[in-house]
């Protein structure tokens, strides 16, 4: 004999096992679907036996009219049924919500790639900016305007600028040489890729030091401002238009709040650009860039539990294109700042 608790779990229409409240009544899946289908029809069913048919788990299919009437008597409401369009929209939103709540898993190969990039980055660029102080910076660059007492006499700003930029490029070269996939390419292509991407990688990594509040670069105890770049040489500095473009890029990228794996993958995408002048193995390099891009996409999607911009990947692609323009303008600027290119033969070679 069924207990009171069992009866409460049964469908109020046919007595089958209920799955929940549907359209305001506790019903089974069968009666839920029947009610939705029947009410959606323009013509209702009729009973040939004066509405006296039994509606049970076994007999429920015999008379749609009596079954519908019992649904209504049990409290099921027609006004709670969504239209086909509304139902499709709700299901689509539910599917989208499930997709967003389920982080995309990185493959083993992608995990290994990220670890390789992070390892090379840590070894060669992890403490790069803290070392700028060894290049005898002018006193005004210090955040507290107090140079360290152990420093040798300072050199002009242009000399310090040349030294730190050469140092950054050297570290970028070490970073790339630490990547097995880069070393596997012909030496000619390695040179072409480095000449094209070295400055871009410098700016991607430098972005981690950019302070949105002050619009300065904070490198260890040093602070670099837009005014410093404008007066890097006693005679002339970087053009204001170029600096505004550069600082806008850094502000936009910094606001995206990238994680370290996203920074290194972005740098790798810049490195493996198959359209650099002089590249011969374009197909192989294109495949490498696609691998970096897919890994970056997967990583971003895997972080969806964090409040991230859903257009983040698209924005990063746009910033890479913007960085390409900055790179070209930077090369022109270097050549036209008096005395600067002669102090930086490595960077002059990169930008030539």
Curated annotation (Swiss-Prot):
The NR LBD domain, residue ranges: 109-352
Chain residues forming the annotated DNA-binding region: 8-83
Keyword terms: Activator, Cytoplasm, Cytoskeleton, DNA-binding, Metal-binding, Nucleus, Phosphoprotein, Receptor, Transcription, Transcription regulation, Zinc, Zinc-finger
Top-rank taxon, per record: Eukaryota
Listed Pfam families: Hormone_recep, zf-C4
GO molecular function: estrogen response element binding; nuclear receptor activity; zinc ion binding
Chief location of this protein within or outside the cell: nucleus
Protein localization: Nucleus; Cytoplasm; Cytoplasm, Cytoskeleton
Keyword flag Zinc: yes
Gene3D superfamilies: Erythroid Transcription Factor GATA-1, subunit A, Retinoid X Receptor
GO CC terms, sorted: chromatin; cytoplasm; cytoskeleton; nucleoplasm; nucleus
Disulfide-bond pairs as recorded: none
Domain notes per entry: Composed by a short N-terminal domain followed by the DNA binding, hinge, and ligand binding/dimerization domains.
Subunit text: Heterodimer of NR1I3 and RXR. Interacts with PSMC4. Interacts with ECT2. Directly interacts with DNAJC7; this complex may also include HSP90. Interacts with CRY1. Interacts with CRY2 in a ligand-dependent manner.
Official protein name in the record: Nuclear receptor subfamily 1 group I member 3
């Amino acid at each position: 004999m069924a207990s009171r608790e069992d009866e409460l779990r049964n469908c109020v229409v046919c007595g089958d096992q209920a799955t929940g409240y549907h359209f305001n009544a506790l019903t089974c899946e069968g009666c839920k679907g029947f009610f939705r289908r029947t009410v959606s029809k323009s013509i209702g069913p009729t009973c040939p036996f004066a509405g006296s048919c039994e509606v049970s788990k076994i007999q429920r299919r015999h008379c749609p009219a009596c079954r519908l009437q019992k649904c209504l008597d049990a409290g099921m409401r027609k006004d709670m049924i969504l239209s086909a369009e509304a139902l499709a929209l709700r299901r689509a939103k539910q599917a989208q919500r499930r997709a967003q709540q389920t982080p995309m898993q990185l493959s083993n190969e992608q995990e290994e790639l990220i670890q390789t990039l992070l390892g090379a980055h840590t070894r060669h660029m992890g403490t790069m900016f803290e070392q700028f102080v060894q290049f005898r910076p002018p006193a005004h660059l210090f955040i507290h305007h107090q140079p360290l007492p152990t420093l040798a006499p300072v050199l002009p700003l242009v000399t310090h600028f040349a030294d730190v930029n050469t140092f950054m490029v050297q570290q970028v070269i070490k970073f790339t040489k630490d990547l097995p996939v880069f070393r596997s390419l012909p030496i000619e292509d390695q040179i072409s890729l480095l000449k094209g991407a070295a400055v871009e990688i410098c700016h991607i990594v430098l972005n981690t030091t950019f302070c949105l509040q002050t619009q300065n670069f904070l490198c260890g105890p040093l602070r670099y401002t837009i005014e410093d770049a404008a007066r890097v040489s006693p005679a002339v500095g970087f053009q204001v238009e170029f600096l505004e473009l550069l600082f806008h890029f850094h502000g936009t990228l910094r606001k995206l709040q990238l994680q370290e794996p996203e920074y290194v993958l972005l740098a790798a995408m810049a490195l493996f650009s198959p359209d650099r002048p002089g590249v011969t193995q374009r197909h192989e390099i294109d495949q490498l860039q696609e691998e970096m891009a897919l890994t970056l996409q997967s990583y971003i999607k895997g972080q969806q539990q964090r409040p991230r911009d859903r257009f983040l990947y698209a924005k990063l692609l746009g910033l890479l294109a913007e960085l390409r323009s900055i790179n070209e303008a930077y090369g022109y600027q270097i050549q036209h700042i008096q005395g600067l290119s002669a102090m930086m033969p490595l960077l002059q070679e990169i930008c030539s």
